[in-house]
Curated annotation (Swiss-Prot):
Family the UniProt entry places it in: Belongs to the metallo-dependent hydrolases superfamily. Uronate isomerase family.
UniProt cross-references to Pfam families, sorted A to Z: UxaC
Gene3D superfamilies: Metal-dependent hydrolases (3.20.20.140), uronate isomerase, domain 2, chain A (1.10.2020.10)
Protein name, per record: Uronate isomerase
Cross-referenced SUPFAM superfamilies: Metallo-dependent hydrolases (SSF51556)
Keywords: Isomerase
Swiss-Prot/TrEMBL catalytic activity: D-glucuronate = D-fructuronate; aldehydo-D-galacturonate = keto-D-tagaturonate
Protein's UniProt keywords contain Phosphoprotein: no
Biological process annotations from GO: D-galacturonate catabolic process; D-glucuronate catabolic process
Highest taxon of the lineage: Bacteria
Length: 470
């Protein structure tokens, strides 16, 4: 019987173990998409205790706590202490067997805290609380200290076009920070004209760009100014959360002006008008990314804020989102082609939340590759609910079957937690075990030089190359 979470966790044969320990584990982390707070990096935040760093803002854990019947006051309540929330989590973790949270929890205790051979639960919670809090009180366990311990080379934060990026400026000016922290452009509130807050947001964009927006070309001018601002801060990637993937042929500016005017006047838009405006903004933005050498990321298929009562109580991003089932292939094909037809499709990473769409994306990327850029269009790593062993394996296998796994840009945390870098370790172990199994079965050569190069490329080198602006 195998022992739980040894040094060879998830590594089933000698080839896999060699690939992981000798080649994957030492590689730096290039975390090109996350939701870390740039302010916490700039200020080098020191965390008061394990409950704070572990549970604050982590909606993966919040969902598990709710599923275990824990009262909301012990999850997000301001009236309860970090310790009380921590103990609620300690009582919940033994109930998460089979959920990736059980693995992640013990990996996070192992690295960076060095706690091994101890199962986390109510019986061990007090001892672990004390050990971890002692370490969190030291400089090595500040926000930046943890990033350095985890060998992080680069992080891409997620930032709104109206953001001042003041903390990115602060980080860039601080010579003591040897980790690159780049903003990523997230313009969801610009192209989602159907949202209730669209008009209010446009007012904020006007103020940030110093451009009055009454026509579509005004919007282009405002966005161009903000794109320039992001570029000056080292931005090299955009990200778009797309719940419903729409497409319509882009109309002329007169029609776009009319659509924008109707929305500003508070009139209801038709579904066609919404699709026309959304497509026009996305295609125009995509062409700007291509001209700047940026990467365009499309995260497709979430249903957000399903629970109205809890949304009113807690707001968005609190653990009430799930997988959508809208069809995406036709609209995605037309959207990408609208940029590619003028040779203005940027480097692009496609992510789907519904795993039934894996093959859609794995085959779609082959339609729009380009010379001079290996893996120009990527099928991104298993996202969100697919960010677990089975989901990662499905994505790796389907990409390898329908594309080139060797050109894959690899893993990202997509997380708000400084302890989530162990997800890169989790991914690397799964990757090495997959390659090791193929080699052991004679499906690929047992060639250490060939396989090690592929592992190192997927773990770090491909992403570093891909996100470099030439």
């Amino acid at each position: 019987m195998a022992t739980f979470m040894t040094e060879d966790f998830l590594l089933k044969n000698d080839i896999a173990r060699t690939l992981y320990h000798k080649y994957a584990a030492p590689m730096p982390i290039y975390d090109f998409h996350c939701h870390l707070s740039p302010q916490e990096i700039a200020d080098d935040r020191r965390f008061d205790n394990l409950g704070q760093i572990w549970l604050e803002g982590d909606h993966y854990k919040w969902r598990a706590l709710r599923s275990a019947g824990v009262d909301e006051s012990l999850i997000t309540g301001k009236e309860t202490s970090d310790y009380e929330k921590y103990m609620a989590w300690a009582n919940t973790v033994p109930k998460t067997l089979g959920n990736p949270l059980y693995h992640w929890t013990h990996l996070e205790l192992r690295r960076p805290f060095g706690i091994t051979g101890t199962l986390f639960g109510p019986d061990t919670a007090e001892s672990i609380w004390t050990q971890c809090n002692e370490k969190l009180a030291t400089p090595a366990f500040s926000a930046r200290g943890i990033m350095q311990q985890m060998n992080v080379r680069m992080v891409g934060t997620t930032d709104d076009p109206i953001d001042s990026l003041e903390y990115h400026h602060q980080i860039a000016a601080d010579d003591s920070i040897d980790i690159e922290v780049a903003p990523s452009w997230r313009p969801d509130k610009v192209f989602k004209i159907e949202l209730d807050g669209f008009v209010d947001y446009l007012g904020k964009l006007e103020a940030a760009a110093d451009v009055s927006i009454t026509r579509f070309d005004d919007l282009r001018q405002a966005l161009t100014r903000r794109l320039d601002h992001f570029a000056a801060c080292g931005c090299r990637a955009s990200d778009h959360g797309i719940e419903t993937l729409r497409f319509a042929p882009v109309p002329d500016d007169a029609q776009l002006d009319a659509i924008l005017g109707k929305r500003l006047a508070g009139e209801t838009l038709s579904e066609l008008e919404i699709a026309q405006f959304t497509t026009a903004v996305l295609v125009w933005l995509g062409r700007q990314y291509a001209a700047r050498g940026w990467v365009m990321q499309l995260h497709i298929g979430a249903i957000r804020n399903n629970n109205t009562r809890m949304f009113r109580l807690l707001g968005p991003d609190t653990g009430f989102d799930s997988i959508g089932d809208n069809n995406i292939s036709w609209a995605l094909s037309r959207l990408l082609d609208s940029m590619d037809v003028t040779n203005e499709l940027p480097k692009t990473i496609l992510y789907c939340l519904n795993p039934r769409d894996n093959e859609v994306l794995a085959t779609m990327i082959g339609n729009f590759q380009g010379p001079g850029i290996a893996g120009k269009v990527q099928f991104g790593s298993g996202w969100w609910f697919n960010d677990q062993k089975d989901g990662m394996l499905r994505q790796l296998e389907q990409l390898s079957q329908m594309g080139l796994l060797s050109q894959f840009v690899g893993m990202l945390t997509d997380s708000r937690s400084f302890l989530s870098y162990t997800r890169h370790e989790y991914f690397r172990r799964i990757l090495c075990n997959l390659l090791g199994q193929w080699a052991q079965d004679g499906e690929i050569p047992d060639d250490e030089a060939m396989l090690s190069r592929m592992v190192q490329d997927i773990c770090f080198n491909n992403a570093q190359r891909y996100f470099t602006i030439k």
